[in-house]
Amino acid sequence: MLDEFGPKRIIDTPIAEGGFAGISVGAAMNGNRPIVEFMTFNFSLVAIDQIINNAAKMRQMSGGQFNIPIVFRGPTASAGQLAATHSQAFENWYANCPGLKVVVPSTPYDAKGLLKSAIRDNDPVIFMESEQMYGDKGEVPEEEYTIPLGVADIKRAGTDVTIVSFGKIIKEAHKAADILAKEGIECEIIDLRTVRPLDFDRSEEHTSELQSLVIIS
């Protein structure tokens, strides 16, 4: 990436999360669309003042004079050989902060399409990935495409019960659905993809059809 885009666009910063998160807010206010990578979202706590009090609130505090199109991305939750301070899941923290959008993809295809949309969005987006899924493989088109934020996806059709989840837990939902299928229970799997905003309409629609809902988080 450095060879392709150059040092003015690809910046290897010191490990000072509050500093580079703050710089990204200023860059966004000046018309750029920065992508900030945290080594792990556990370290985003060092920058939480910049994320919560500046990035998330700036458009409202400025009366709409500034957009803050930032993507904060990186791995979240547990993975192999990580200590407790590197294994926390912060989806619910950020999803409860007004002004932020929270995206948690479950497949390579979704990751590309959602990241493209996150970069184009005029609000700050928390883009969370599972380190346990970095080795996953899947079909990803080379051509340009986007996936709209806030739209859930039906990953598996079923007629008996709806399972709703997101991120790496979608794989566990598929395992559970395979087991239940052997018992004659057909599970539908809905991948939220975006934790904030939630696609309540699709979840409610399919739950009302099947009358049975299981939420896994």
List each model region and its residues.
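Thiamine diphosphate
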Residues: M1-P124, M128, E131-E204, ...
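Residue-level detector of flexible, active-site-proximal loop/helix-junction positions
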Residues: E17, Y109, Y134, T194-R196, ...
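Short, cationic motifs built from Arg/Lys/His that form the positively charged side of catalytic pockets
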Residues: M128-E131, S212
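Single conserved hydrophobic/aromatic residue that forms the stacking wall/gate
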Residues: E205-S217
